[in-house]
Regions:
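Short, well-ordered beta-strand segments enriched in hydrophobic/aromatic residues
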Residues: 183-191
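Short, solvent-exposed, Trp/other aromatic-anchored flexible loops in extracytoplasmic proteins
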Residues: 209-277, 286-287
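Low-complexity, intrinsically disordered terminal/linker segments enriched in charged
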Residues: 31, 109-167, 223-227, 265-288
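Short, acidic/polar linear motifs in exposed loop/turn regions
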Residues: 191-195, 210
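Short, hydrophobic/aromatic beta-strand segments
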Residues: 196-202, 213-218
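Exposed beta-sheet edge and beta->alpha loop/turn motif
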Residues: 71-145, 193
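Short solvent-exposed beta->alpha transition segments
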Residues: 25-82
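C-terminal motif of bacterial Sec signal peptides marking the signal peptidase cleavage site
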Residues: 15-16
Length: 288
């Protein structure tokens, strides 16, 4: 009986070691494929990799056998992915790889955690709107959430941008040409919003007598406009000689729009409300 038990334990240990070795090989193969296309496609090892909608990078992956957990036909590999990003900065990410067997008893990666890196703005927005919590998500689930979160953020971005375009207005402006043909002028603008606005930019587009485009010039309004405040600024353009017509427009930087989004109050239920609204719209579309 003791011999049987010992033999059984030995078999289990050997099987576990074998599975760990297979998991290490599979994981290394996957990370190698991220930087070496001749080695294979990432989807050869991680069938749903394309669903993550990322281009992960890897130079070296560090795997310790002690960081591998085997449970029946599932294996969890915790590793460190070392790489240099597009900006030339060295990165080291903690990644978890989830492995199981397919119907042919072949090992494959069915999920991961840590391959997706989140932009700071979208991470902040996700936490404020209730899309991202404190508990980290696995990558496949995170990719699905991020797709919807980006849509919500674009919606909020354009709402904010349109509000700026319509409520920070040009009250009056004029321009003329100097003796050398260069154009210069002045404008008066007003902030009709209940909050301060900074980072206002302007663009002047010049045309000839046939309304053909000649050139454009841009600049920034150096002042932060408080609610209901009016402000005059001047501009000088040297890249259009003797224009006949001109058009002045106000623009707002992405950073300025995002800063205003960050200043808003959020209940933490915006993401779920957006999802519910989307489902209702889909249902109505199907009923038509």
């Amino acid at each position: 009986m003791r011999c049987f038990v010992f033999s059984l334990l030995t078999t289990i240990v050997l099987s576990s070691c074998s599975h760990k070795n297979e998991a290490i090989e599979l994981t290394r193969s996957f990370f190698t494929s991220l930087s070496d296309s001749t080695y294979g496609s990432p989807t050869d090892f991680y069938p749903q990799y394309d669903s993550l909608q990322i281009e992960a990078k890897s130079d070296v992956v560090d795997i310790e056998e002690s960081d591998i957990t085997v449970k029946n036909d599932s294996i969890i590999v915790r590793c460190m992915n070392n790489y240099t990003d597009a900006k030339g900065t060295f990165k080291q990410d903690s990644v978890v790889i989830f492995i199981t067997k397919d119907k042919d008893s072949e090992w494959y990666i069915y999920n991961s955690r840590g391959l997706i890196t989140i932009d700071k703005d979208i991470e902040w927005f996700g936490k404020k709107t209730g899309a991202l919590g404190k508990k980290p998500m696995n990558d496949l689930q995170l990719a699905e959430v991020l797709g919807k979160l980006y849509s919500l953020m674009r919606k909020k971005y354009w709402e904010q941008y349109i509000e700026l375009k319509t409520q920070v207005e040009i009250l009056d402006w004029s321009w003329e040409t100097s003796y050398d043909g260069t154009a210069h002028g002045e404008a008066r603008i007003k902030n009709k919003l209940p909050y301060s606005v900074s980072g206002i930019k302007y663009q002047v587009t010049y045309y000839d007598r046939q309304h053909n485009y000649m050139a454009e010039d841009d600049g920034s309004v150096s002042k932060t406009l408080n609610p209901e405040e009016k402000y005059n600024f001047t501009f000088w353009s040297s890249n259009a000689k003797y224009p006949s017509r001109a058009r002045l427009t106000l623009e707002f930087s992405d950073r300025g729009v995002y800063d205003l989004l960050k200043a808003k109050y959020y209940t933490g239920t915006e993401f779920q409300e957006y999802i519910k609204k989307g489902k209702k719209q889909d249902k109505r579309t199907k009923e038509i």
